[in-house]
Every structure is written in C-alpha cells, then in structure tokens.
Amino acid sequence: MKCTRETAMVKSLLLLMLGLAILREVAARKNPKAGVPALQKAGNCPPLEDNTVRVDIRIFNQNQGISVPREFQNRSSSPWDYNITRDPHRFPSEIAEAQCRHSGCINAQGQEDSTMNSVAIQQEILVLRREPQGCSNSFRLEKMLLKVGCTCVKPIVHQAA
C-alpha cells in the first residue's frame, strides 16, 4: 500500500511539473521579453509563402439583379488599362490599378482630342500590411490611394493678366 501511495505522489509531482512547464512556455510566447520561444529563433520560421490569411469577402444583401459590363474601360472616352501590383507583405497581395492610355480624350470619330484631358479616378482603400514579429505575423490597416479608372475633363486654363 505504501508503494502505490508513493507512485501516486510521484505521478502527481510529474504532472505538476509538466503543467508548470507548459504554463511557462505559453507565458513566454505571449510576452517575448520573458523568454524567446524556439520557433522565433532566426532560421526556424516557415517561409512567408506558406502563411495565408483567410478573409470572407462575401457581401450580404447585395442586389443580384444588376450586372456590370466588364469592358467599360474600352468604351470610355478616356480608356484605361489595368496593371497588377504585387506586394507579398500586403493583403490582398495583388491589386489591379488603372493607367490611362492617352493624355487626351477620344472623340466620336475614335481620334485623340488633345483639347481635353484624360485623368485617373482615385479611390482610397484599406489594405492589411503584414508586420512580421518573429515567426508570428501581425497586421495593421493601411490606407492606399488606388487608381480605379479614368475620366475625361476640361483642362485647367490659367489666363495671363
């Protein structure tokens, strides 16, 4: 009977020591100053490409009946093309940005009219910027000015006095 009581006590002490070791490891991960976890040592982090972020971008209560023409950038009097910008430290990592094809506008005959100006339409958007901290990543919101299309405007004319 004495042997089983000693065995039970040894098991309890081992479980207590294991629990304390786990708590210490968790505390070290939450507070890097308390101790550097093994994963955060240089060279032990997984490659950046293996890290992904999942964001549900479905829009609820959107009107499903309206379809937007896909090639309106070609039918505009100020046509534009899209260029893809890539940044692995940004989410989304790829963003399409408009670039005006001409400095002037296209007239009814399909010719460029240099008496009018083709200018980019800009929209401020929010993106997530990845900030690596050891192996874990945190993200911060960042404003970005994005060219979303082009429009035709009258030029600004300054009169000399």
Swiss-Prot record:
UniProt subcellular location: Secreted
Disulfide bonds: C100-C150, C105-C152
Tissue: Expressed by T-helper 17 cells (Th17) (at protein level). The expression pattern reflects the differentiation state. In fully differentiated Th17 cells, IL17A-IL17F heterodimers are produced at higher levels than IL17A-IL17A and IL17F-IL17F dimers. Dominantly secreted in intestine. Expressed by resident cells of the lamina propria, both epithelial cells and immune cell subsets including natural killer cells, dendritic cells, macrophages and various T and B cell subsets. Expressed by epithelial cells and innate immune cells in the colon. Expressed in group 3 innate lymphoid cells.
Keywords: Adaptive immunity, Cytokine, Disulfide bond, Glycoprotein, Immunity, Inflammatory response, Innate immunity, Secreted, Signal
Effect of deleting the gene: Mutant mice are born healthy at the expected Mendelian ratio, are fertile, and have no apparent phenotypic abnormalities. They show increased susceptibility to S.aureus upper respiratory infection. Mutant mice are protected from chemically induced colitis, a model of human inflammatory bowel disease.
Any one GO BP annotation for this protein: positive regulation of antimicrobial peptide production
Secreted listed as a keyword: yes
Gene3D superfamilies named in the record: Cystine-knot cytokines
GO MF terms, alphabetically ordered: cytokine activity; cytokine binding; cytokine receptor binding; protein heterodimerization activity; protein homodimerization activity
Domain of life: Eukaryota
Residues linked to a glycan: N83
One cellular component term from this protein's GO annotations in UniProt: extracellular space
Upregulating conditions: Induced upon antigen receptor binding in the presence of IL6 and TGB1. Up-regulated by IL23A-IL12B, IL1B and TNF and inhibited by IFNG and IL4 in CD4-positive T cells. Induced upon fungal infection in innate lymphoid cells. Induced in lung epithelial cells upon bacterial and fungal infection. Induced in brown adipose tissue upon cold exposure.
Pfam families documented for this protein: IL17
Subunit: Homodimer; disulfide-linked. Heterodimer with IL17A (IL17A-IL17F). Forms complexes with IL17RA and IL17RC receptors with 2:1 binding stoichiometry: two receptor chains for one interleukin molecule. IL17F homodimer forms predominantly complexes with IL17RC homodimer, whereas IL17A-IL17F favors complexes with IL17RA-IL17RC. IL17RA and IL17RC chains cannot distinguish between IL17A and IL17F molecules, potentially enabling the formation of topologically distinct complexes.
Protein name per UniProt: Interleukin-17F
Source organism (scientific name): Mus musculus
The encoding gene: Il17f
